[in-house]
């Protein structure tokens, strides 16, 4: 007998595929259970991919929380709080999922043998908590999307459209959250009753489709706002967004990338690992919420185009003084009074016509309406009266406040003790 162990002759054949080799072991179904090396490798690769993905989610969400906290000037607005909650929930959900991956419930031993002796109640509780945190995460994302729709169409001239679109978003978001909740409850019920039972993916697929529909709907609205902003600025003769700025808005502030990933997740073959695209898309949605919120709340009637609003509050006008020389249709005091009633066309999506008879009126604190000054006349025949926020020191000097043919206002020598406010009413 040779001292060397005999080698398999299969090693000499280049056509032999070792991944097709069989592993025989004892499982819940008996001692004759077999599995190929390929199936085992696919399972291990899937778990490694999930670990990398959810580890990346933890790092990205944690960094986004810190950066958003540093750059935001107003941290008390609802949309900032909602976005911070969304980022925190994705961090918590990813942490729990990593705990699930490291537990016995996601181990190779249990998934291939189905022997549940090694599964503790703690592993089951982590599984249930992960599912419920995912429901809360989806709810926070939907609330942020609904709030952005409401902010975009909050102007007086667009309340009808805003109510309809906000209602559609609310119904779609509520349905999505309910479906995720049903999916989580059914999964937890099946696991608590029988650890070896496989959960039904029917409701999960419906919930994922509804979430992708919400993101696609919001992407469309933010894109429409960009188109109308470009149209409005061209009409007003203001400086346009350059090509890089438009590309930046489309890439990061309209949720276009997660929208594409949601579509690819269902268009491609799931056996090729495309199911992870849903997790990546959810991460990109959550990370994009602060940027899309900045775009949703930004105004587009200033002389210099900007898509960044770190105040995270609705901006319908420019916070500039008459002394700066930078003007637009809207100008307010840097310390606006809460008693003012703002009447305006949100974001100037459809600007005032050049041929319309517009009148510019001031409103003092007592709510009464001041008569327009007949000595102040614009080029299109409109009459104007300029008032400061106290409503008592306003004077309009003839030919010093004019409405130009390019529909922008020029201010000079306006007698006021504070930064004045002009409201356009038709």
Swiss-Prot record:
The keyword Transmembrane helix applies. One of its GO terms (cellular component) is G protein-coupled receptor homodimeric complex. Keywords: G-protein coupled receptor, Membrane, Pheromone response, Receptor, Transducer, Transmembrane, Transmembrane helix. The chain crosses the membrane at residues 50-72, 79-101, 131-153, 160-182, 202-224, 245-267, 277-299. GO terms for molecular function: mating-type factor pheromone receptor activity. GO terms for biological process: pheromone-dependent signal transduction involved in conjugation with cellular fusion. It holds the Pfam family STE2. It is a multi-pass membrane protein. It is found in: Membrane. The keyword Repressor does not apply. Its main location: membrane. Signal peptide: none annotated. Belongs to the G-protein coupled receptor 4 family. Receptor for the peptide pheromone alpha factor, the mating factor of yeast. This is Pheromone alpha factor receptor. The lineage of its organism: Eukaryota, Fungi, Dikarya, Ascomycota, Saccharomycotina. The gene is STE2.
């Amino acid at each position: 007998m040779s001292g060397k162990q005999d080698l398999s002759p299969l090693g000499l054949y280049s056509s032999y595929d070792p991944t097709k080799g069989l592993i025989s072991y004892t499982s819940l179904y008996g001692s004759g259970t077999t599995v190929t090396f390929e199936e085992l490798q696919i399972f291990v690769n899937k778990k490694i991919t999930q670990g990398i993905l959810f580890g990346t989610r933890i790092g990205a969400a944690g960094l986004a929380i810190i950066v958003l906290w540093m750059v935001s000037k107003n941290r008390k607005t609802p949309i900032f709080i909602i976005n911070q909650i969304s980022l925190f929930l994705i961090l918590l959900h990813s942490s729990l999922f990593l705990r699930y991956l490291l537990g016995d419930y996601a181990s190779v031993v249990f998934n291939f043998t189905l022997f549940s002796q090694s599964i503790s109640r703690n592993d089951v509780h982590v599984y249930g908590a992960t599912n419920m945190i995912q429901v809360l995460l989806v709810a926070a994302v939907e609330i942020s999307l609904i709030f952005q729709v409401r902010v975009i169409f909050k102007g007086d001239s667009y309340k009808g459209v805003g109510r309809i679109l906000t209602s559609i978003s609310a119904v779609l978001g509520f349905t999505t959250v309910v479906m995720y909740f049903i999916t989580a409850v059914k999964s937890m019920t099946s696991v608590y009753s029988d650890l070896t039972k496989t959960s039904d993916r029917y409701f999960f697929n419906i919930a994922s489709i509804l979430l992708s529909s919400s993101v696609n709907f919001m992407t469309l609205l933010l894109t429409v706002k960009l188109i109308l902003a470009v149209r409005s600025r061209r009409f007003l003769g203001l400086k346009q967004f350059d090509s890089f700025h438009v590309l930046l808005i489309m890439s990061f502030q309209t949720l276009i990338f997660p929208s594409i990933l949601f579509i690819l997740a269902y268009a491609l073959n799931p056996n090729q690992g495309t199911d992870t695209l849903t997790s990546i898309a959810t991460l990109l949605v959550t990370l994009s919420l602060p940027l899309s919120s900045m775009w949703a709340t930004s105004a587009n009637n200033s002389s210099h185009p900007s898509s960044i609003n770190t105040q995270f509050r609705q901006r319908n006008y420019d916070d500039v003084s008459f002394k700066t020389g930078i003007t637009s249709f809207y100008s307010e005091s840097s310390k606006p009074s809460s008693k003012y009633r703002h009447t305006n066309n949100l974001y100037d999506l459809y600007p005032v016509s050049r041929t319309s008879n517009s009148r510019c009126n001031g409103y003092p604190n007592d709510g009464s309406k001041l008569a327009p000054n007949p000595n102040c006349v614009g080029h299109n025949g409109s009459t104007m009266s300029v008032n400061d926020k106290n409503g008592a020191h306003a004077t309009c000097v003839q030919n010093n406040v004019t409405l130009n043919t390019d529909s922008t206002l020029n201010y000079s020598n306006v007698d006021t003790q504070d930064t004045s406010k002009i409201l356009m009413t038709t």
